[in-house]
Swiss-Prot record:
This is Octanoyltransferase. In the reaction, the free carboxyl group of octanoic acid is attached via an amide linkage to the epsilon-amino group of a specific lysine residue of lipoyl domains of lipoate-dependent enzymes. One of its GO terms (molecular function) is lipoyl(octanoyl) transferase activity. GO terms for biological process: protein modification process. It catalyses: octanoyl-[ACP] + L-lysyl-[protein] = N(6)-octanoyl-L-lysyl-[protein] + holo-[ACP] + H(+). Signal peptide: none annotated. It comes from the Bacteria. The gene is lipB. It is found in: Cytoplasm. Catalyzes the transfer of endogenously produced octanoic acid from octanoyl-acyl-carrier-protein onto the lipoyl domains of lipoate-dependent enzymes. Lipoyl-ACP can also act as a substrate although octanoyl-ACP is likely to be the physiological substrate. Pathway: Protein modification; protein lipoylation via endogenous pathway; protein N(6)-(lipoyl)lysine from octanoyl-[acyl-carrier-protein]: step 1/2. It comes from Sodalis glossinidius (strain morsitans). InterPro entries: aa-tRNA-synth_II/BPL/LPL, BPL_LPL_catalytic, Octanoyltransferase, Octanoyltransferase_CS. It is an enzyme of class 2 (transferase). Residues 31-206 form the BPL/LPL catalytic domain.
Length: 219
């Protein structure tokens, strides 16, 4: 089993605050820094990835649009969506970018299987799908051999804002969520399973779940 990860449960936090913290953490870390996983939800926000095109923002309305340096196109975050950010030293864990993407996709597939939901990844588009419908989006950034950003799993949320964009740059892509397929399932049910499956696939362990670290996130 590889070295232990720090797990942080951040609750509901503005996207820009957490993005700032990820950058600050990654810029400050050394080869001795522990890897971290952050579990968080965001207030409603559209985020444009590095490859994002304005044409895929159809009618954002009053929902803010934030530029992100993660990979990919536009997506939507909102309460009831479990976001998991993975801040990993890829060299130390002997992971390539493709293998990390595969690990995250496998994490979602295994998590959903625990709720009797059959899901799959696609070779032509990152993420996890139920049939033709997308349930989880992925977007990563690598800096100094370390990853940040991560995945967003739709659990029990308002999906209607996805109709205001071409999700991940695909016109007409339908989104689905865990609670539509396993009624009554919420974030509190999914989050511990998601974390456990990720740690299992990484062959990693974790200590007690922590909250904000003011050194990186502010108070």
């Amino acid at each position: 089993m590889s070295e232990s990860l720090v797990i942080r449960q951040l609750g509901l936090q503005p996207y820009e605050r957490v993005s700032f913290a990820m950058h600050r953490f990654t810029d400050a870390r050394s080869t001795a820094s522990a890897d971290e996983i952050w579990l968080v939800q965001h207030p409603q926000v559209f985020t444009q990835g590095q490859a994002g095109k304005a044409e895929h923002l159809l009618q954002p309305g009053a929902i803010p649009v934030v530029q992100s340096d993660r990979g990919g196109q536009v997506t939507f975050h909102g309460p009831g969506q479990q976001v998991m950010y993975v801040l990993l030293d890829l060299r130390r864990r002997r992971l390539g970018v493709r293998s990390l993407v595969t690990l995250l996709e496998q994490t979602i597939v295994a998590t959903l299987a625990c709720f009797s939901i059959s899901a799959h990844a696609r070779t032509d588009a990152p993420g996890v799908y139920i049939g033709a419908d997308k349930i989880c989006s992925l977007g990563l950034r690598i800096r100094k051999g370390c990853s940040f950003h991560g995945l967003a799993l739709n659990v029990a949320m308002d999906l209607s804002p996805f109709l205001r964009i071409n999700p991940c740059g695909y016109a007409g892509l339908r989104m689905t969520q865990v609670s539509d397929l396993a009624p009554g399932t919420g974030i509190d049910d999914v989050a511990p399973v998601l974390l456990a499956e990720c740690l299992r696939l990484m062959k990693a362990s974790a200590g007690e779940i922590q909250g904000w670290d003011p050194a990186y996130y502010g108070t």
